[in-house]
Structures are given as structure tokens and as C-alpha cells.
Amino acid sequence: MIWLARIVVLALVLAAMPERAAASSPLAPLPATIRVNISLLGTSYAKIGSTGSLTVTREDGAVLYQGFKNTLARRGVRRLADPSETLVSVRDPDDRRSLLQLFRQARQRAQVEDIPIVTIPFEFSIEGDGSDPLAAPLFSAQQITGLHYVASGGLLTFNGRAYRGTLDLTRDDEGDMIIVNQVDTASYLASVIGSEEPTTWMPEALAAQAIAARTYLATHLARHDNYDIEGDTRDQEYDGLAGEATSTVRAVDRTAGLIATYNGRPIEALYSANAGGMTEDSENVYANALPYLRSVPSPADEIAQASSWGHTSWQWTTEFTAPQLRSYIGARGIDVGDPERIDLTRLTATGRVLSAKIVGSSGSRDIGKDAPRYYFGLRSTLFNVTTHPEETEYVEASNAERVRQLEFLGATVVRTFTMNVKDPDRAAHTLRVLGWQYRLPARFVFTGKGYGHGVGMSQWGAQGMALGGKSAEEILRHYYLGIEITTLGGA
């Protein structure tokens, strides 16, 4: 399961969405293939290869490369205007391990000999063995140039991750470089399930996720020019082949074409990792009050508490000293001086923070709805915050997680607790550390429950319901009120 919350980007998208009216026309099936943006924001480097043979073509059909090596597409590459005029040479790899050091030497030589360094807006090259990092690229241009990647006898790889289908280097809606994976819709859905949830979860939980993911896809297509959907938490997490498993493929197959509808139209099938025991009304996170996204109990969320890796999605604690909090919120555009207190000014009926005020030495700032997750780096808005003065705390030596947290806060060890242990086979004694007493600085302590926005289906709750014998349809009807399970057709 991906515990990253669907944050500000998703909020902005959904805020502008009107509630859908009932439709008289039949629902169109999903397309056989979809285009998924698999790059992060601000991508400037793409390493693309294949487990078989790779062919790369330009938009005009010209073949740039065909072979078995990795390719590199880069923006803003700094190069010598005329490498032949410099005395810099590439030494043996043992003598010149750092390409950064080599570049610095080249830059210094260029400064001495007045050889200009230019910035190449876009270039395409083949990854070599490192023997000549200053080698000219296969192709360069003054702007991002569309490229098409096809694998023969294998799968494509992007930055080390394998993908089915084809890849395209293109531009997003703002003109930035992105990599788009065109893949059959069934494979996309199978990967989303395994990228969002553990593939070992109960079949009914995976089936519920399959229907929710398919429904989400049906309502979020055709919003971009060069791709259909984001491949991360801006829409749905998609890890390519790594997300697929026999269980997720089976979940897609057994629910083929099924989506959740309300008044004959696909719903906004929102979901999050853990609702903390109670889901939230949609208008308390997004803009619209949707009748099927009402607050409902989610008691099965508590099963996460027994998980060695998922327990922090049920209950969690986040701590900041005042300087740390000032730095954290400052990086997100809030400057109130040194934070002095945080007032939770409005709560929802479920206890989630609807608005808060940060009061500091030089002012205050109000934040609302789902924003506290972003500004404070929290797992959910179902939280409380307290201020703690300087104090001491004992930590057992086995509690490595708490030791790491205290080191982050700048806590200092004031006493070490040890005991002598006698070796029964020898006369020697060994000193065993039992724990430490730390002095903690004054700090803000956020304690909360849940992970994500809390609207719609809780993934941990769905797993708990499945363990209790509930079907996928029963799970979906619990979290999305008044819905029908409808055959859409397609994947």
C-alpha cells in the first residue's frame, strides 16, 4: 500500500468538479489502452532501456537508436562549446572515478583558455561505459523533442523500473518533459492494485480495490493533452510491472468491466490508506458534498495496529522543535517567525481539523480543510497538537525508532543505563547497555490516527472487512453510500 496521501494537487482538481447528473445514455467502455504519466514533477533526466532490444524513433519517424544499451534523454546539459580545443583528457577509470570531478576540471580549463561552456536545452545519447563522458550526443535540439520507445523481446525500463507497452518522451500541459507509458488497461489496473495495497491481502479487498481503481479511471480520463492519468498519488499509484502479481491480475479479471455508479454515472471513487476509524464527508476535504461520500464508521481500520509495517497508519506521532517547525512551514510558504502555538479552530464531527491557526513571533496564518497535512507533514487531519517544555525521557536500547526520532529533535543523552553480564563459560564480565535517559528540547507534538484524506474507501478498513467475511460489493456499498455495481465494459 502506498501511504502517501493524495494532497494538494488532487484537492485542486476535485475542487472544480461539479456533481454529476444522472445520464440517459449508456456508459461507454474504458479504452483498451491508456497513457500514464510515470514521471515526477520537473523531470529533466530519463534513463530508458529494455530487457530486450530497444528502438527509439523521433516524431518524424526517423530511427535514432536501435540496440541493447540504455539511453539518456536530458534537459539543460552543460557542455564545452568546442571540446576539441581543451587539453582535458579522460584518464583511466581508476584515476578518474568521479564524473563530477572531471567536469570541474573541464570547466576550470575552459575558464583558463576562454573556451565557453554552453547549455544544451535537450539532448539524447547512449549510456556508455564511462570512458568518454564528454562524448557528443546522438541528437540535440533547442527544445524538448518527442521520442517513441519500443522494446522487442523484452520490457521497457525507465529509471530502473520495468513497464509493459511503449514509452513516449513528450510534454505535459505546462510544457515540461515527461515520460508516458502506453499500456493495456487491464495491466494498468493490475499494477495499481499491487501498487496501492499488498498483493497478499484478501481477495475481496483486492477486488474492491480493482472496482474502485477502475471507477476512478473512468472519471479521470481525457484531462490532459498528451496523457490520460498521473501514475502517482496525484491520481493512482502505478509501479509498472512491479505492482503486478497473480492475485492482482485475478482481481482485475474477476471484476472485469465493473464500476461503482450513482444515479447511473461513475462515482468519484476516492480512497485512502486508513480512515482512523471513521471516514469523512467529502465537503470537509474537497469542494462538493457528494451524497455517496458521507462519513461512515470504519472500525476495521484498527487491524493495522497489529502490522509491523502498517501500524503507523493507525496511530502516529510527529514532533518538531520550534526552529524545525519554522523551517518546515517556511519551505511551504508560511512565515510567522518562531512558532509559539497552533490553535485548532474548527473540527468536523469526526474530529478532523477543518481549520487551524499558526501563531508566531511575527504574525499568524490560518490554514483550512486538508491543508494541515501538507503544512505540518502529517499523515491525516485527525490529530491533536500539544506543546511540551524541556523534559527527560527514558528509552530502551531496543527502541531504535524512538532513538532515531530523538536524535532528529536534537535530544541529548544525560545518562546511560547498563548492567554487568557474566559469561557462564568464562570468568569475564561484559557491559550491556539497557537504555538511555534523554533531555528533550521544547517541542510541538502532533498525535493522530489514520493516513490520507479519509474520504471514501479505507484500504485497511476494506482488508479488515474482507477478513471478517465481507464481499467486495459489501465493502464498496459500506464506504460509498447508495451506489450500484454496474457493468461498464472493457478491462
Predicted regions mapped to residue ranges:
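Conserved, single-site charged/polar hotspot
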Residues: I2-A491
